[in-house]
């Protein structure tokens, strides 16, 4: 199969599963918003949940796969399946030991951890005590989700992407049920949400066990800390974690500084980030997950010309999707937040605060997605240090910009700093990758980007005028949903039509791929 087709189909599968999960995530946030709004209780939960959830995003969206896939594939090819699975079992036992220890430490040292991540919470306040309690309750999630992402890495190695991509939906369902069913029965309702988190994490791990066993995994009750291949994975994984963690670390810095701002700032950033996570998860993360096994295979076969083509196509595909998405999110930020969440405790003030966060996070969408595509290229070359170094520079820039911008722009300044540092990150990564592998079709990428900005600008005018004419934030929910859907549909139609007229290669490729898949299914 053509590499571009394989990449697009795999990314489409992951993206489709991710879309289902993210839609459930919006329902989850809607339920949480209605129940808890932007109160100190919500702030406490979001701080407590972010600490273990960062582990899922860092490990689950690349770090384990970045280290595991190349080494596991190499062992399978050189020594056979049996040796590869022995290494995997040993790695599982080591990971299990580390995760149990880390979960216990998280629960035990929760007060001190919260002092670091939310210094603006007074230590004697109800807000601080609740955050500590929630962190301790959700500590087991740290264990369960770590094991779940290990399973994801194994399944991705065998090109099984659908199940790992859909498992986050289980977490969202459990959190929804926890809020609706358990919370009303408790004196401290927010603890019902914590129960949902723990249950969701456990199920994400358990549901993947049969799949990895079918692939060939066998549990071996022994640990070899000095195993050469395991140590090799660890050496690759440590810098990989930091390289992929930059975005999440920047978000943690935002949370830390937002705790010094007026109440609700943490919630504004959370909800704004959730909206940006939709296109980031569907397209950026999906393409990043799909591209690593392909690049690793090309490097193993020393097919560097195909590797360059794959990377260039991935970048153009990301730009084709994220440039119009950025314009759309910026122009429709208020209608989107108002329609999706403004009800119950989520009032107009919360909508306006969230819309500001969404505006500034949207500026960095192309960069956020670009990082997910470029970083795996380094990992396929067994280079996990370069992204980590770039990550250090990016995080330092983010901290400096945070301190400069949070004064005049409040929480919006924190979001903007994250976006600018991500843009710096992806530009530097591309520059360093080009030095490593040579030309990547930069002129073609730049020419495509210029056309896409023009087409997206025309689309933006159509979307803005329609929204200005028809959207009323005080109208009935059903009408607002209809208007918002119509507005987005008009944007998609205008963008597609003009892209077709300008003969955009990415659109032409996707249309042909869709037609072939339809013809296959009809045979």
Identify the residue ranges that each predicted region occupies.
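Membrane-embedded alpha-helical bundles of multi-pass transporters/translocases
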Residues: 1-523
